[in-house]
Amino acid sequence: MNIMDSSPLLASVMKQNAHCGELKYDFSCELYRMSTFSTFPVNVPVSERRLARAGFYYTGVQDKVKCFSCGLVLDNWQPGDNAMEKHKQVYPSCSFVQNMLSLNNLGLSTHSAFSPLVASNLSPSLRSMTLSPSFEQVGYFSGSFSSFPRDPVTTRAAEDLSHLRSKLQNPSMSTEEARLRTSHAWPLMCLWPAEVAKAGLDDLGTADKVACVNCGVKLSNWEPKDNAMSEHRRHFPNCPFVENLMRDQPSFNVSNVTMQTHEARVKTFINWPTRIPVQPEQLADAGFYYVGRNDDVKCFCCDGGLRCWESGDDPWIEHAKWFPRCEYLLRVKGGEFVSQVQARFPHLLWNSSCTTSDKPVDENMDPIIHFEPGESPSEDAIMMNTPVVKAALEMGFSRRLIKQTVQSKILATEENYKTVNDLVSELLTAEDEKREEEKERQFEEVASDDLSLIRKNRMALFQRLTSVLPILGSLLSAKVITELEHDVIKQTTQTPSQARELIDTVLVKGNAAASIFRNCLKDFDPVLYKDLFVEKSMKYVPTEDVSGLPMEEQLRRLQEERTCKVCMDKEVSIVFIPCGHLVVCKECAPSLRKCPICRGTIKGTVRTFLS
């Protein structure tokens, strides 16, 4: 397989740099090895980058990889496998492994330098990655940590070149335009020269090494998803260039002030699912923090949310793709980067509503309609082919869910969604509701027959249940109900009212309460137990008219009926739709997906004000 056919990145590099031609078939180049993994199975539990870093390239067969140096072929990768350790264990005499071990041993000290003697013992491909021996007191930095990594070859090298400051502070390099002119032979396409120059860095003309014209820091070994300004600021936050740039730039409004710092955002990823192929550091760099659910993240500045991360996703590109007007994005990456990303996705250019601060699409503008194969210009087709809906489809939401959500919107308001943000927000809510309904459905499938019988004969039990207190005590002993709930029901004076409160409480508490109810009823009321759980036949006889009761008794019963069946404290005020039950207060209602009395799905609620 020709690398030029499978890697546009390397193809661009080759066109710009004639001296890179030798890398076309050079498996000793990690970048080339990485490009061979374009068709690597996605379900393999070892990352392509770690395999390439360990000297392997993809053979194109299942998950088989081969070392460019010793020819070792490995496959059948398992969770927890370490590519380099496995390489070292199976073929310890491999020259590539030996060279890497030598570099690791050198990288253990806090301050180290590669002497000419050591560097001469390395292979040419590795020697080209080492630091120049003329630079002493070299430190290596990884991510946002100040610790020193074991693998300096594959980690960003950050060198203190303060002793060369007079040379680097050449007035001719003081402008961004001048620094950009030095990048005519810049070897990387994953990092734009304009971005490097904007970060105050000057191309030194050797590999991918750059130096700050102000503080003297030298950075190299750039990785595909690095950001020049972020790396400059992270490793040397006290650099005068960085400080002046941040101070001179006007402040901007942010959605979440507590997530402004990189450190704060990183801390939110403590429970980030390990199966997600995008690393927290990358997401935090791009302004995102973890919301604690699935793989959902949000930008601290524009409040834009992204999810469903896949292997190869670049957080910065996704940020620019969906939220191009984010002020943080524009400040860090620049307008040129955003424009280039948007140009790659022309179908998003119409969308002036990609961020939460954007204005709705002009109602008077004719939408751009693209019909799918087999679709006709029907109302449904037009509804599903608006730019906003197209963007939601591109984000990975199911077409069926989008159609249901849009139809509900049109039925309720007689208009379609005008912004992507509004539609995505509703889709996320709809997905949450579907997940909850699925959980409820599974719960219903395993729900006991006891609970079903109690619910079915609820009204008849109100009339016939007399052994309320023993059952109430058993529920309290089993910690199925709280002392407050116990006391509220116990203080109810009339047995029918106590029975009503008890039965509704059992229905709310679920299977555990139903099981205790059954066992107690068997001991204290065998006749009722037989009718309910054995014969399964109970008849409800409408009660007498309460209008003839004393006013005090009527008020007491009314008060009992008005008590929330969940918290047993506040007054009921929410009617569930469509079942019509009025059994909970406004504080308890939001947590319920199904009516605690009939188990019907709650499609809507109506706030009531009882007088």
Swiss-Prot record:
Organism whose genome encodes this protein: Gallus gallus (Chicken)
BP terms from Gene Ontology: apoptotic process; negative regulation of apoptotic process; negative regulation of necroptotic process; positive regulation of protein ubiquitination; regulation of cell cycle
Encoding gene, per UniProt annotation: ITA
Main localization (coarse): nucleus
GO cellular component: cytoplasm; nucleus
Alphabetically ordered keywords of this record: Apoptosis, Cytoplasm, Metal-binding, Nucleus, Repeat, Zinc, Zinc-finger
CDD domains in UniProt: BIR, CARD_BIRC2_BIRC3, RING-HC_BIRC2_3_7, UBA_BIRC2_3
Placement of BIR repeats on the sequence: 30-97, 176-242, 262-329
Domain CARD, chain residue ranges per copy: 446-536
Top-level taxon: Eukaryota
Protein name, per record: Inhibitor of apoptosis protein
Induction text: High levels are induced within 4-8 hours of T-cell activation in spleen and thymus.
Entry comment, domain topic: The ring finger is important for its antiapoptotic effect.
Family: Belongs to the IAP family.
SUPFAM superfamilies: DEATH domain, Inhibitor of apoptosis (IAP) repeat
Function: Apoptotic suppressor.
Zinc finger residue extent: RING-type: 564-599
UniProt-annotated binding residues for Zn(2+): 299, 302, 319, 326
Compartments reported by the entry: Nucleus; Cytoplasm
Molecular function GO labels: cysteine-type endopeptidase inhibitor activity involved in apoptotic process; ubiquitin protein ligase activity; zinc ion binding
Tissues expressing this chain: Cells of the T-lymphocyte lineage. Found in both cortical and medullary cells of the thymus. Expressed at relatively high levels also in spleen, bursa, intestine and lung and at very low levels in testis, brain and skeletal muscle.
